Amino acid sequence: MNSVDLKEDLQSLLSLENTHQNLSVPKLVEKILARDEGVLTSTGAVRATTGAYTGRSPKDKFIVKEESSEHKIDWGQVNQPISKEAFDRLYTKVVSYLKERDELFVFEGFAGADERYRMPITVVNEFAWHNLFAKQLFIRPDGSTPSSNEKPFTILSAPHFKADPETDGTNSETFIIVSFEKRTILIGGTEYAGEMKKSIFSVMNYLLPEQDILSMHCSANVGQEGDVALFFGLSGTGKTTLSASASRKLIGDDEHGWSGSGVFNIEGGCYAKCVNLSEEKEPQIYKAISFGSVLENVVLDEETREADYDDTFFTENTRAAYPIEMIDNIVKPSIAGHPSAIVFLTADAFGVLPPISRLTKEQAMYHFLSGYTSKLAGTERGVTSPETTFSTCFGSPFLPLPAHVYAEMLGKKIDEHGAKVFLVNTGWTGGGYGTGKRMNLAHTRAMVQAAIEGDLDNAEMITDDIFGLHIPLHIPGVPDEVLQPSKTWDDQEAYQEKAHFLANEFKKNFQKFSHAASDIEAKGGPLV
């Protein structure tokens, strides 16, 4: 199969009488309701459920092994290879399946807010609510947006099409397959809308570094003086919450590029976790869930259609998708200068990492490569309670290239622009998961504010004797004892045991990196 066939197949789908291209939000909402794909909530949002798959399915994600890219990809459990022949067979089946649908929905937009680096995308959906999701999450073209001569990356999404592992070369009925040569993503067997978003992110994580742009799984905001802050962390660690600040303008909540000019959002919307969401704790997100927004797997009252964000009947991984314009204080376009502060967020299930610490450059590289956090319930299938994990660059599931490519780029950027780096634990305090409690959000906000506003630049610090981290002794609005983990534990022997255990876990994990990273480990790793 060559690119001409692909182009003809796509054109045949787009030209079908039942294909709806670039429908407005109200028309998509009408289609969703008429097709019984979702219901309206009391605030006017659409609520849809996703069946068995309420999170990503990482074991079903593949990259096509192609001559132009196979020597660049970091093959393994994250980036599983699949043959060109298997892709071609599935592609033909998916196109045939989509042609037989009563209706198809197409969105044409972009990934990348900086026009110099943006990538055109075409999303073909079996579901109208998936198309609304794509319209709200990716960048919507406006009249002034110049057309791109670049060939679009196309998503063909067929949730009700199920693969046959024996004949199709997949691991299950579900598949998410990326072909870089054919600039096509096939998604089938799962109704979880997040697969579309993360597939495009994976593509950008392959393409942007080729242009000397660091692609990052982070949120970003900017202060009144133009000072930019980045927040790295996996799902549920607080990226979206902590970057939605009343005093700072949001650049984006999840995916960014860092070019020679500064930072830009890859997306045009937000995909916020909304388990236990409240107007009091997260007013910006709460308010954003209005007409045109999509609620995923959120429980509604049968009569009033009011959302119950505390009810996890479907999953703990409940989500809200909405365009970034729903947030009051945003930067438009979603572009800003170079970061002055970088925050690594982790949810430490053992409760032994300090709630905030200042990192040297070597420590920043070490913790970026380590990407320690806890998998939180429901962000992937099969995970029902927190468990310790290391996710390289705080985004390992989405990184096609070897880790050192991204780490070296980050180190270079820190050197060039003098960004200060902090490690913030939004996980547990006073004990590990099950005995301790989750960090107080107000305390975390106060610590982050002090870090990004430069209040910790000359603060008095002590050095943790296990992890070598530099811990501030005082931060306004935070009790002093909270800042030092050992002081929050009743059982000091248990604290020492857990802290040493975690330090050893860091060391064991770091063995997977080449000896070239030994200097980073010596200067940036635990002291024990």
Swiss-Prot record:
List where in the cell it is found: Cytoplasm
Cofactor-binding details, from the entry: Binds 1 Mn(2+) ion per subunit.
Q: Which InterPro entries match?
A: PEP_carboxykinase_ATP, PEP_carboxykinase_C, PEP_carboxykinase_N
Q: Which molecular-function annotations from GO does this UniProt entry contain?
A: ATP binding; metal ion binding; phosphoenolpyruvate carboxykinase (ATP) activity
Q: Which cofactor does it need?
A: Mn(2+)
Residues involved in Mn(2+) binding: K198, H217, D254
Keywords carried by this UniProt record: ATP-binding, Cytoplasm, Decarboxylase, Gluconeogenesis, Lyase, Manganese, Metal-binding, Nucleotide-binding
Q: Name one GO cellular component term.
A: cytosol
Q: Which Pfam families match?
A: PEPCK_ATP
Primary localisation category: cytoplasm
User: Can you cite a GO biological process for this protein?
Assistant: gluconeogenesis
Annotated binding of ATP, by residue: K198, H217, G233, L234, S235, G236, T237, G238, K239, T240, T241, E282, R319, T444
Q: In which pathway does it act?
A: Carbohydrate biosynthesis; gluconeogenesis
Q: Which residues bind substrate?
A: R56, Y192, K198, R319
Tell me what reaction this enzyme catalyses.
oxaloacetate + ATP = phosphoenolpyruvate + ADP + CO2
> What Enzyme Commission number(s) does the record list for this chain?
4.1.1.49
TM region positions: none
Which principal EC class is assigned to this enzyme? lyase
Which family, according to the similarity comment? Belongs to the phosphoenolpyruvate carboxykinase (ATP) family.
The job of this chain, per UniProt, is described as: Involved in the gluconeogenesis. Catalyzes the conversion of oxaloacetate (OAA) to phosphoenolpyruvate (PEP) through direct phosphoryl transfer between the nucleoside triphosphate and OAA.
The protein depicted here goes by the name Phosphoenolpyruvate carboxykinase (ATP)
Q: Which organism is it from?
A: Bacillus pumilus (strain SAFR-032)
